[in-house]
Amino acid sequence: MSIIYLVINSFIFILPAYVANATPCIFGGGAPIDGGKCFFDGRRIIGNGVSWKGTFFGLFCGTITAILEGIIFNLNIFGTVAFNFNVFEWGIVGLLLSAGALFGDAIGSFIKRRLGLAQGRPAPILDQLGFIVFALLFVYPFAPVSYEMGIFLLVITPMIHLSANIIAYKLGIKDVWW
């Protein structure tokens, strides 16, 4: 697989997870998933940063992104890609990637609370890779990716995540640059 082919197909495949992970920053807020409850250690289970509204919109936007990819690539508007999914299958892939990304983000928040880190505080590696690892794990039974693609995504995602956060901060979408 050529490097260009790997890069293009990796971004096409993972885009729904990236969208799902970013959407709660824009459309989130409201009631937290943990209901404001505390864990055995007296700290919040997850915190206010993971809400039902953000989760819903993350799932919705990530899945819609994949369905749109399915429509575009099944019409061969931009040529062929490495994935031979019909539109329905793209929707399933998008839902799985989105659910995995959001679950990974929630797990990251859970771990950060156990470590005593307040909401919004940085946790390098955990913040950048938790969502992508779980997105790939959730989708793997339905659409396994190659080792090359998995490694590429694990290497490139922290840089993309940091860049996106800096842009969101400069646009006033996020309160912190990390």
Curated annotation (Swiss-Prot):
InterPro entries assigned to the protein according to its UniProt record, in alphabetical order: CarS, CarS_archaea
Cofactors named for this entry: Mg(2+)
Compartments where located: Cell membrane
The reaction(s) this protein catalyses: 2,3-bis-O-(geranylgeranyl)-sn-glycerol 1-phosphate + CTP + H(+) = CDP-2,3-bis-O-(geranylgeranyl)-sn-glycerol + diphosphate
Any GO BP: glycerophospholipid biosynthetic process
Transmembrane feature ranges: 3-23, 55-75, 91-111, 125-145, 149-169
Membrane-topology descriptor: Multi-pass membrane protein
Disulfide-bonded cysteines: none
Protein keywords: Cell membrane, Lipid biosynthesis, Lipid metabolism, Magnesium, Membrane, Phospholipid biosynthesis, Phospholipid metabolism, Transferase, Transmembrane, Transmembrane helix
EC annotation from Swiss-Prot or TrEMBL: 2.7.7.67
Highest taxon in the source lineage: Archaea
GO cellular component: plasma membrane
GO molecular function terms listed in the Swiss-Prot or TrEMBL record: CDP-2,3-bis-(O-geranylgeranyl)-sn-glycerol synthase activity
Pathway: Membrane lipid metabolism; glycerophospholipid metabolism
Function: Catalyzes the formation of CDP-2,3-bis-(O-geranylgeranyl)-sn-glycerol (CDP-archaeol) from 2,3-bis-(O-geranylgeranyl)-sn-glycerol 1-phosphate (DGGGP) and CTP. This reaction is the third ether-bond-formation step in the biosynthesis of archaeal membrane lipids.
Record family assignment: Belongs to the CDP-archaeol synthase family.
Protein's name according to its UniProt entry: CDP-archaeol synthase
Organism: Methanococcus aeolicus (strain ATCC BAA-1280 / DSM 17508 / OCM 812 / Nankai-3)
Gene designation per UniProt: carS
